[in-house]
Design a protein with these regions (language model features):
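Catalytic core of membrane glycerolipid acyltransferases/transacylases, capturing the structured
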Residues: 18, 32-92
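Glycine-rich helix-loop-beta junction characteristic of Rossmann-like nucleotide cofactor-binding loops
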Residues: 27-31
């Protein structure tokens, strides 16, 4: 067990394991060595617990890029810090510094995780079948040459809805465990026609890993 895996083991409350099941498939697509950009959809703060599970099962730390405010969220922030996360200040100059830190991590053969949607979608964007992504993942892939490994997850919003202050776990909320599902796909074949075209390919690969029902309720507030 690596130091990072040990920290995450400590952070993941054992009682939660009675009420959450992680169904993760596609780990054969997750490279065991070399630089990797891991890109997936974003539905809940509980998504970061899923990434912690990927670290535990995949055996590789994930340097998660996330908006700097998340590093101050209880438990979630501790997970981000434990994984050596890269805080992103959306102010232009500081965002460039975060991007540079991600390049350095990839050049060192590390895994950098990103959620190209940038934030948990609201309203119709949360429920809709089409995921819209920003171009950061594509630009990072072009600059580093690292492969983009897509993942799709669902069920996290049931455990930690956007409007909730924390995860809804335990007999007060559920009579039986809730299953969170994750599907990891093969490297995205980027068309190379620029960041916009590459982003479209990345988002399509993520959507292909999701079931048709995953964008449905519960619906966050507008």
């Amino acid at each position: 067990m690596t130091d990072v895996q040990g920290k995450l083991q400590h952070l993941f409350n054992p009682r939660w394991q009675r009420w959450v099941r992680f169904d993760i498939a596609g780990l054969e697509h997750y490279p065991r060595t070399g630089p990797v950009i891991l890109a997936g959809n974003h539905r809940s703060y509980f998504d970061f617990f899923v990434l912690a599970q990927l670290v535990r099962r995949g055996g590789r730390p994930i340097r998660m890029m996330a908006k700097k405010e998340l590093f101050d969220v209880p438990v979630v922030g501790r997970i981000c810090h434990a994984m050596g996360g890269i805080p992103v200040d959306r102010h232009f100059t500081r965002a460039i510094e975060s991007y540079a830190a991600a390049i350095v991590a990839l050049e060192a053969g590390e895994v950098v995780g990103m959620m190209p949607q940038g934030t948990i979608p609201r309203g119709d964007a949360f429920r809709g079948p089409v995921l819209k992504g920003k171009t950061g993942v594509a630009r990072l892939a072009e600059a580093s040459g690292a492969p983009v490994i897509p993942f799709g997850l669902w069920g996290t919003d049931v455990i930690w809805p956007r409007e909730a202050k924390g995860p809804r776990i335990g007999p007060r909320h559920w009579r039986r465990p809730v299953t969170v599902r994750v599907r990891i796909g093969p490297p995205v074949q980027l068309p190379g026609g620029g960041a916009v075209a590459d982003t479209a390919a990345i988002m399509a690969a993520i959507m292909d890993l999701l079931p048709p029902s995953s964008p449905l309720p519960p619906l966050p507030p507008p």
